[in-house]
């Protein structure tokens, strides 16, 4: 079995758009947290539908020589292909397997590389980070954003959410079966430093599974956050738990139903952490 976790599939644009809205809201409206100034060449790895890349290009359309490459993941049997972004002249899409050597980038140095939501899709993060570091110009920045793997609570209410706990347990088993490291996202900062990045920083934010919180900021992002988490659970169940663990469709539906029931229970104060790591290439 392919060791990548869950491949993107056709028809996932709705998910990509929801994911984009979620991360931008969790960044208080910012497209990125890295302190990037006047980038001339930007690379968005694993772009999906290209929502982040096109918005980035639109926001910075007045800046000179801004190029945004948005790469799709996966096995590209036809090699590398290029296409322009829709109505965004400074955005170019490249269909290539980002886990292969980046021969198409040999003549360019990049000012900013953006990675979002790729934990579980990459065979070797050390190899990817090595390519990223080599491709950045001196002073260039990398930003990686993703969600933590486990559901959390601060008040012990998660102990009453057996559906969510069971879903997490099966998700961990699925990751182990596929050779993936559980909790890898929490170690990305250390991996960036090992790859040569400096000034590495980590930012986390709680993202609620429902609108249970009285905190103003948590409530403002609750609807987007809850919708994304539910879609994540459904995708993991159908594309991960069932084929990888060889569970029956009835079993998967039961596990998912119990998890969603707990997710919608406002007495269970559950959340997941959004992680963002930034680092600079100084030499």
UniProtKB/Swiss-Prot annotation:
Assigned EC number: 2.1.1.-
Record GO terms (molecular function): methyltransferase activity
Record flagged with keyword Metal-binding: no
Catalytic activity entry: campesine A + S-adenosyl-L-methionine = campesine B + S-adenosyl-L-homocysteine + H(+)
Pathway: Alkaloid biosynthesis
Industrial or biotech use: Campesine G features good insecticidal activity against the global honeybee pest Galleria mellonella, which supports its future application in the development of biopesticides.
Family (UniProt): Belongs to the methyltransferase superfamily. LaeA methyltransferase family.
Name of the protein: Methyltransferase cpsF
Gene (name only): cpsF
